[in-house]
Structures are given as structure tokens and as C-alpha cells.
């Protein structure tokens, strides 16, 4: 048996919890003060619900962040300081260079690993492998239904009422995209970190009222040749802003801690 801790308990964490195999136990949930009592009632007494890393009673084999950038920045350093390996969904937080350096330094000092989760896309392993030989161009296009962009910085850029065809509303670097759209563009930061970096990865964000699926399209060129990946992914039913595959990538990491053969 292995124990895991979740940072955050929103729609993604609930989906991962629901799908955990019997040999992986959710022992602790770290949440905000305002939601703690509600989540305690929901989970019962078998799972510890805490609001600070200082309240941790049992040290888990792995912590997985599914809280968003604010939760990650609040708790990650203390978690790594307790020598707990950490999986991260909110990769957009790496646009904060000071925070990213602090994460790496703390993990190294305490002999633990930080796992950057692939999230909503495939091909991250190929892009990272190609980066060792040299990549010249990496372009990511994120296409989603307008409803998936609502409530984000896109509200200032999109005329939702008059949107009738696919519209590119943002073009910039992965650093800019992940900072402006933290809930929607963590995947852009993941691709960038795996490849040519946050400042040299081009990102296009598109609102398309005809879509039923979220479309993630990656194009890369380098010494290895050319790579092109297009994925049509369903969002979680509980949260249209969250990719179901992102939840499954977190589930995969949880399952790996009890597997001898690693993929």
C-alpha cells in the first residue's frame, strides 16, 4: 500500500480520487481554510483534511498538486522541505523564475523529485527527447469552445456574443500565455519546459464555437525531423475548463509509485 496527498480537492482531484486503485490510498487532502469543513464532511474521518503542511500527521509517499498556481506557491516549498516527492499540474507557475528556482533548490537539498505532469497533451516525452539533439521551432495551438475560456483573461479579448467562427485571440510566448491564462494554458508551459523554453515557444489560443472537444495541436522541428500531434480531448463533465486527460495524467503518477516497471 502507498499513501498519497492531494493539494486541492476540486473537480480534478475528485476524479483522480474516484479512480485510485485499491493499493493507492488517499491519506491527506490539503485545502483552503474556507473549504476545509465542507470537504471534511464530504470525505469523512478516514482522510485527514488539513489547511497547512505544518498540520501533516502522516508523511505520504507522494503529494500531487491539483489546486491551481496559488495553492502550489503556498504549499510546495514546505512539502518538498519534508522530503515528499511532488507532482505538479499547475506548470504555469514556472513562469515565476524565482519560484521555479526555489522549487528546484529545495527538492535538491531534500533529495526528492518534482514531477511535471504532461496534463492535457501527449507527446511530451518525444519533445523532451528531441530537445537534447536540438529543436528549432515549437508551436502550440490551443483550441477550445468559448465556454471554456470564460472567466479568464480571454473575457477582455473575445466578443462572445458575436463569435460565430474560430477566432485566434492570443498569440505570444508560452511564458505570456501561462501567466495570462493560468487555468487554461498550463499545457503551453509544459510543452515549453520539455522543449525550447518558455520564451521561445510560440502559443496561439483559439476560441471556436463549433467545437465539441478541446483541440491541442503541437508542431515541432529539429535535428530529429518534424513532429506534429493533434488531440481532441473532452473536458471533465464537472468542470469545462479542465481536461479529463489532465486528471488521468495525475492518476498515472499516483499509480506509478507502486509500480516496478515505469513508463
From Swiss-Prot:
Protein name per Swiss-Prot or TrEMBL: L-aspartate dehydrogenase
EC number assigned by the record: 1.4.1.21
Provide the species name. Psychrobacter cryohalolentis (strain ATCC BAA-1226 / DSM 17306 / VKM B-2378 / K5)
A molecular function (GO) held by this record is: oxidoreductase activity, acting on the CH-NH2 group of donors, NAD or NADP as acceptor
Metabolic or biological pathway, per its Swiss-Prot or TrEMBL entry: Cofactor biosynthesis; NAD(+) biosynthesis; iminoaspartate from L-aspartate (dehydrogenase route): step 1/1
| Family designation | Belongs to the L-aspartate dehydrogenase family.
Task: Please tell me where NAD(+) binds in this chain.
Answer: 120, 186
The question of whether Acyltransferase is a record keyword is answered with: no
Recorded superkingdom: Bacteria
Q: Name one GO biological process term.
A: NAD biosynthetic process
Q: Which of the seven top EC classes does this enzyme belong to?
A: oxidoreductase
Q: Which reaction does it catalyse?
A: L-aspartate + NADP(+) + H2O = oxaloacetate + NH4(+) + NADPH + H(+); L-aspartate + NAD(+) + H2O = oxaloacetate + NH4(+) + NADH + H(+)
- What are the UniProt keywords, alphabetically? NAD, NADP, Oxidoreductase, Pyridine nucleotide biosynthesis
What this protein is reported to do is described as:
Specifically catalyzes the NAD or NADP-dependent dehydrogenation of L-aspartate to iminoaspartate.
* Residues annotated as the enzyme's active site: 216
